[in-house]
UniProtKB/Swiss-Prot annotation:
It comes from the Eukaryota. Keywords: Membrane, Transmembrane, Transmembrane helix. GO terms for cellular component: membrane. The lineage of its organism: Eukaryota, Fungi, Dikarya, Ascomycota, Saccharomycotina. This is Regulator of rDNA transcription protein 7.
Length: 113
């Protein structure tokens, strides 16, 4: 995706291409998160019905619903990316902005991929 944005923006606007790549990745993660919320509601219905069956049988061990790990992973990724964005913008404002921005972009993208 980075190379597609680089081709659209050209060499002169390389930091913009880097920023668009990060923004695209964040939006993709948000889309995954939104779809996982739909799945989570389905999981809640399934586990709630299983809990009711266990209670009717009076079994001591109920099935307890816990949050899926991919939601937690998404929140950690989003939090770390938001922490890096101010640094990214600070590097853009300096004279050597393109070099630092591309370095920061590679660090952020390597974390996501």
């Amino acid at each position: 995706m980075y190379f597609a944005f680089k081709g659209l923006c050209g060499r002169r606007f390389l930091p913009i291409a880097s920023f668009l790549t990060i923004l695209n990745r964040i939006l993709f993660q948000y889309w995954l998160f939104y779809n996982s919320l739909k799945e989570e509601k389905t999981f809640q219905k399934i586990f709630f019905s299983m809990n009711l069956k266990c209670r009717k049988k009076k079994e001591p061990n109920h099935i307890i619903y816990s949050q899926p790990p991919f939601l937690l992973g998404f929140m950690v990724q989003l939090q770390s990316c938001v922490k890096l964005l101010p640094l990214y913008l600070l590097f853009l404002l300096q004279g050597n902005g393109a070099h630092y921005a591309s370095a920061m972009t590679s660090k952020v993208l390597s974390f996501f991929l």
